């Protein structure tokens, strides 16, 4: 089972993801990023790839899609905040978006 990141691990994880656009969610132990693609097909194709990865991880994002933009929030509900699962999924999302 996942464990909530302690303050030091959380700060390190968020700092490592900040360069690629991930940000803290105000008032919540979560991270957020806006992905913008060339068009709807690319956005939806990326979401499909991420869905397969997320299902294999048994860790699912909160997300929404409007045309070529995908808003993503990551947190581990079972632990009430960020876990290593969120960091790993964020990194995989970034790689798939390249």
UniProtKB/Swiss-Prot annotation:
InterPro entries: PCD_sf (IPR036428), Pterin_deHydtase (IPR001533). Keywords: Lyase. Pfam families: Pterin_4a (PF01329). Gene3D superfamilies: Transcriptional coactivator/pterin dehydratase. Signal peptide: none annotated. GO terms for molecular function: 4-alpha-hydroxytetrahydrobiopterin dehydratase activity. One of its GO terms (biological process) is tetrahydrobiopterin biosynthetic process. Its EC number is 4.2.1.96. It catalyses: (4aS,6R)-4a-hydroxy-L-erythro-5,6,7,8-tetrahydrobiopterin = (6R)-L-erythro-6,7-dihydrobiopterin + H2O. PANTHER family: PTERIN-4-ALPHA-CARBINOLAMINE DEHYDRATASE. Belongs to the pterin-4-alpha-carbinolamine dehydratase family. HAMAP family: Pterin_4_alpha (MF_00434). This is Putative pterin-4-alpha-carbinolamine dehydratase. The lineage of its organism: Bacteria, Pseudomonadati, Pseudomonadota, Alphaproteobacteria, Rhodobacterales.
């Amino acid at each position: 089972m996942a464990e909530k990141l302690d303050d030091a691990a959380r700060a390190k994880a968020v700092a490592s993801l900040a360069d690629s656009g991930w940000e803290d969610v105000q008032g919540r132990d979560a991270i957020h990023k806006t992905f913008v693609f060339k068009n709807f097909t690319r956005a939806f194709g990326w979401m499909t790839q991420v869905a397969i990865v997320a299902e294999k991880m048994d860790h699912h994002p909160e997300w929404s899609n409007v045309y070529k933009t995908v808003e993503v929030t990551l947190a581990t509900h079972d632990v009430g905040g960020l876990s290593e699962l969120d960091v790993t999924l964020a990194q995989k999302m970034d790689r798939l978006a390249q």
